[in-house]
């Protein structure tokens, strides 16, 4: 994922900077080691679900919003940014729209 910007990593870095905290401070508050946090922020590693949960709690942000960014990054890492990936995402969007409409009362 190093060739692409990590939206999740950038977001986490912005949260940390807004709070004027070091990686070490976040590490202590999340029990995730500093080198791993640095790699997540730089987009060199994907966070685990447990790490996302800890980061969401630490920063007091929605775990679901972190998981959305995480899922998008997993897709892009696996399939790259190209027309095929775009078309596949559009197809998934069409296929999932009825579910979203039923379960949340809104359409994508």
Where are these regions (language model features)?
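Short alpha-helical DNA-recognition segment
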Residues: 20-39
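Interfacial/linker helices and their anchor residues that mediate assembly or domain coupling
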Residues: 68-108
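Helix-turn-helix DNA-binding elements, focusing on the entry/boundary residues of the two helices
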Residues: 12, 23, 34, 49-52
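The alpha-helix within a helix-turn-helix
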Residues: 16, 27, 56
């Amino acid at each position: 994922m190093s060739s692409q910007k990590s939206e999740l990593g950038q977001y986490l870095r912005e949260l940390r900077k807004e709070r004027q905290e070091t990686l070490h401070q976040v590490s202590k508050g999340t029990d995730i080691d500093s080198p791993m946090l640095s790699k997540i922020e730089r987009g060199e590693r994907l966070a685990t679900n447990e790490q996302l949960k800890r980061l969401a709690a630490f920063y007091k942000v929605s775990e679901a919003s972190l998981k959305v960014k995480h899922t998008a990054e997993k897709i892009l890492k696996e399939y790259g940014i190209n027309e095929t990936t775009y078309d596949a995402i559009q197809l998934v969007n069409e296929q999932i729209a009825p579910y979203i409409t039923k379960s949340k009362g809104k359409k994508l």
